[in-house]
Amino acid sequence: MRRLGPWVVSVVVGLSCSTVFAETGKAVIQGTSAGSKVSGTAKLTDTRQGLKVVVNVAGVPPGKHGLHIHEKGACGDQGKAAGGHFNPAKVPHGFLPKDGPTKAHAGDMGNIDVGPNGSGKLAVVLPGVSLKGTGGTPSVDGRAIILHEKVDDFGQPTGNAGGRIGCGVIETTKE
């Protein structure tokens, strides 16, 4: 028993000195057209319930705007380079947090409400999705977040949210 003491102390000291980094994702959102004042950030964190996404935007026209993860990690051509909604299960459009992964695209985040000052925040958990494809779930790493010009009415096939006014590519970071 006496010999175990120094070993336990060395393990505890070693663990307390090590740094553990959690992988998170981030996207820097910028306007998709010349002269646009749209800007923002998205932070993505895996949780037991799914992928937590927190988006903050500024310089956006007031009102509700559709917010989706798109299939490609590119923002060129006024956001069109991002392709369509991220939909690996080939299911109808919907609101993922409410409808679940069998009745909504993997990237359907709903709407962000932007106030009169042009800023807005959305915090949502996307079930059945992860940053890096953990546990066989679809991965969003390297894909784009698109801010649309209009409200997502959850209609088919893509919610009628109009053009793409903001875009940011999701990248993995260490925290």
Residue ranges, per PLM feature:
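N-terminal secretory signal peptides that target proteins for export/translocation
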Residues: M1-R2
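N-terminal leader/targeting pre-sequences
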Residues: G5, V12-G14, S18-E175
